[in-house]
Amino acid sequence: MGIRSFRPLTPGTRQAAISDFKEITKTEPEKSLTHHKHSKQGRNNRGVVTSRHRGGGHKRLYRIIDFRRDKRDIPAKVAAIEYDPNRNARIALLFYKDGEKRYIIAPAGLGVGDTVIAGENAPFEVGNALPLSRIPLGTEVHNIELVPGRGGQMVRAAGGFAQVVAKEGDYVTIRLPSKEVRMIRRECYATIGKVGNAEARNISLGKAGRTRHRGQRPHVRGSVMNPVDHPHGGGEGRAPIGRSGPMTPWGKPALGRKTRNKKKRSSDLIVRRRTQG
């Protein structure tokens, strides 16, 4: 993937830097691997806003991604690299030898015509899925399972990768993109390589309209609201917060407040917590 910039002919193109989509080889998704995604617009079943700053945007078809990689020891050929509007990574369309088609997250370096396979004895090549116990130390991996058979839950964003740093007993130690180090069961599967489209972090949408097209609504600062609307609101001019620290719109402490449940059982598997900030 490359980043495309524009001549500054308009305010919207002056700051814009978007993907050139050159790695995309197929424009229409595989119909059998999609279903309609009803946009909730940030509302619950009663129509009450439960997630702010959501609404509008273009309609999307959801692509059914194979995070489990449970089709074991059957080779598959990469038929296409496609765009997915539901994530910043690209997806790869696989044609299995038995005729089945599936989508996976496209790792960096995987191209059309390559062959991938999942299984305990799969070779150590990009796109192949193996148990963590079979992956050499120092290997970059993504789409990592937390529970055997549940499917990959971690390291799925564009450019992301984790590293296998140690093996001991029934657990393998992984360093995550957040620098958190945690232990995972050795039977859990992971995919070799890092997620593709790493340049996604360099994208600059350039104008508000592109953000609205993604289904994101404006994020209004609390300090410019009235006191009835936000704890930061009110005052004359650019007034300070007037509280001991930043607050959420509902009056709870924000910024730096730890939200993880202290009694969560998996906390024992975290060797080092992620870096804050």
Curated annotation (Swiss-Prot):
Sorted UniProt keywords: Ribonucleoprotein, Ribosomal protein, RNA-binding, rRNA-binding
A Gene Ontology term for the protein's cellular component: large ribosomal subunit
Key word Signal present: no
Transmembrane in keyword set: no
Region (Disordered): 28-55, 207-277
GO MF: rRNA binding; structural constituent of ribosome; transferase activity
Family matches, as SMART domains: Ribosomal_L2, Ribosomal_L2_C
Start-end of Basic residues biased regions: 34-43, 209-220, 255-265
GO-annotated biological processes: translation
One of the Pfam families matching this protein, by short name: Ribosomal_L2
Assembly: Part of the 50S ribosomal subunit. Forms a bridge to the 30S subunit in the 70S ribosome.
PANTHER family reported in the protein's UniProt record: LARGE RIBOSOMAL SUBUNIT PROTEIN UL2M (PTHR13691:SF5), RIBOSOMAL PROTEIN L2 (PTHR13691)
Homology family: Belongs to the universal ribosomal protein uL2 family.
Job description of the protein: One of the primary rRNA binding proteins. Required for association of the 30S and 50S subunits to form the 70S ribosome, for tRNA binding and peptide bond formation. It has been suggested to have peptidyltransferase activity; this is somewhat controversial. Makes several contacts with the 16S rRNA in the 70S ribosome.
Record protein name field: Large ribosomal subunit protein uL2
Native source species: Microcystis aeruginosa (strain NIES-843 / IAM M-2473)
